[in-house]
Amino acid sequence: MLTSAKILLISILSSLLLFGSHGEEGQKTNTTESTAEDLKTMENQSVPLESKANLTSDKENRETSNPKASNFSFEDPSNKTHETGFYSNLSTDNSSRSPSLMPTLSPRSPSTHSFVSKLPWNSSIADNSLLPASAPPNTTVPVSSENFTLSSINDTMKAPDNSSITVSNLPSGPNTTSVTPMVTEGWPTTTRESMEGFTVYQETTLHPTLKFTNNSKIFPNTSDPQEENRNTGVVFGAILGAILGASLLSLVGYLLCGKRKTDSFSHRRLYDDRNEPVLRLDNAPEPYDMSFGNSSYYNPTANDSSTSAGGENAHDSIPMDDIPPLRTSV
C-alpha cells in the first residue's frame, strides 16, 4: 500500500511539473511574439521633425551639457530596445511564476513604471526631470482560473513645440495566461504506460512481526544456557530415579515372596517316601467285584475270599464268545 501511494504521488507531481513547463513555454513564445511586433511597429512609425539641422544641433548640445544623460535620448534605438526588453522580461517573470508557489502578485516598485520625459529641443537635458506618467501595470489574479493579465505600457515624450511623439507597446492580443488547477478525485488508475518513466524502489523499512523464532540469537543472554542445562539435568535425574526405584521395589518384593513360598505347602513331600502308597484299597468296607480279569494286582486277599465263596474261577483273559460276529456288507 505504501509503495503504490508513493508511486501515485510521484506521478501527480510529475504531471504538474510538465503542465507548468508547457505553460512557461507558451508564455515565453507569446512574449517573444509581442516583443517582435512592438519592434516592427517602432521601426515603421515616422517621427515628424522640424529640420535635420536642428535635430543634430540639439543632440550635440545635449551630449556636451550632460554626457551621462545622452544614453536616454529618444533617437538611440538601442536604448528603446533595452527598455522594451526590460518590460518584456518583467512580464515574462510575472507570468512565468508557478501559481502554486505565488498565488498573488505584489505591485512592482515605481522604478519599473513607464515614464514621460519632457525633452526640449533647445535646452539641456539637465534642466528636465523624469515624471511618472502612467499607473503601474495592472496585474489581475483571479483565484478560480489564475489568469495573469498584463496591461499595455505607454511611453509618451512631449516636445515644447506642441508636437507629441507617442510610442505605445500594444500587443496584437491580450497576453493572458490561464492556468487551470488540477483536481484529482480518488486514486487514478496506474497502467503500464504511465509507469514506464518511473523506477520502483523497494522499501527497506523493517516492519515488526509477531513471529519470533529464537530470541536468544537476537538478544543473547548469559543465564539462558545455564537454565536449559539445569532443566535437562532435572528431567534426566527424574527419569533415572524412577527406573532405579521401580527396580528396587521389584527386588524387595521378589525376596519377600520367595521366603513365604518356602514356608508353605510343597509337592515334594509326596515323593519323599516311595514305599508309602498314595491310594490304599485295603481299608475298603466292602469287597469289590474282582471277577473281571486278574484282580490280584489290586487286592490279593479279596481275590482269595471271592474264589472260595463264589466258586468262580478267575480268568486271566477277556472272554470273547459273547461278542456277535460282524455283519458283512452285501
From Swiss-Prot:
Glycans are attached at residues 30, 44, 54, 71, 79, 89, 94, 122, 138, 147, 154, 162, 175, 214, 221. Residues 1-23 form the signal peptide. Residues 24-232 are extracellular. This is Mucin-15. The gene is MUC15. The chain crosses the membrane at residues 233-253. Highly glycosylated (N- and O-linked carbohydrates). The lineage of its organism: Eukaryota, Metazoa, Chordata, Craniata, Vertebrata. PANTHER family: MUCIN-15. InterPro entries: Mucin-15. Residues 254-330 are cytoplasmic. Mainly expressed on apical surfaces of the mammary epithelial cells. Residues 42-56, 86-115, 292-310 have a biased composition (Polar residues). One of its GO terms (cellular component) is plasma membrane. The keyword Secreted applies. The keyword Ubl conjugation does not apply. Residues 23-115, 164-185, 279-330 are annotated as: Disordered. Pfam families: Mucin15 (PF15672). Keywords: Cell membrane, Glycoprotein, Membrane, Secreted, Signal, Transmembrane, Transmembrane helix.
